[in-house]
């Protein structure tokens, strides 16, 4: 059975990831194309009559005080609060052969950007072990 609190947490986790990715895209455009878009001004615009208006935007706008959202400890605290619910829903979906790509990719994304041990280390270890591609005939 679906735990609706877990489902709400999973949905909230993914919504927050959407905003984080939007902020990072804006920041990248600022750096790469010389745009000068203020994240806090964008949040203000989005919170006032935008189609994506939500209480979450108001919270982010009020709390946004760091240059890089990934440096904001409150954001990661929120992710950690919602993460168990997301994992519960993904576990249930896997056991029932239900694909939830947005949910699973949101979890993968946060795991990749917050992990000290990335999956690329496994790839590098494989390259270190098997990189010569020599066939041992002994």
Predicted regions and their residues:
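C-terminal substrate-binding/catalytic lobe of Rossmann-fold NAD(P)-dependent dehydrogenases
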Residues: 1-94, 100
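C-terminal amphipathic alpha-helical interaction region
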Residues: 80, 85-138
């Amino acid at each position: 059975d679906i735990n609706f609190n877990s489902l709400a947490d999973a949905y909230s986790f993914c919504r927050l990831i959407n905003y984080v990715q939007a902020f990072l895209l804006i920041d990248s455009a600022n750096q790469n194309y010389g745009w000068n878009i203020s994240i806090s001004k964008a949040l203000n615009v989005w919170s006032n009559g935008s189609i994506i208006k939500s209480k979450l935007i108001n919270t982010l706008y009020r709390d946004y005080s760091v240059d890089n959202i990934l440096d904001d400890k409150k954001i990661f605290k929120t992710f950690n609060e919602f993460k168990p619910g997301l994992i519960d829903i993904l576990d249930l979906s896997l056991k029932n052969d239900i694909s939830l790509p947005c949910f699973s990719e949101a979890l993968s994304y946060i795991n990749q950007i917050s992990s000290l041990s990335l999956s690329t280390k496994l790839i590098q270890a494989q390259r270190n072990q098997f990189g010569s591609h020599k066939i041992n005939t002994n």
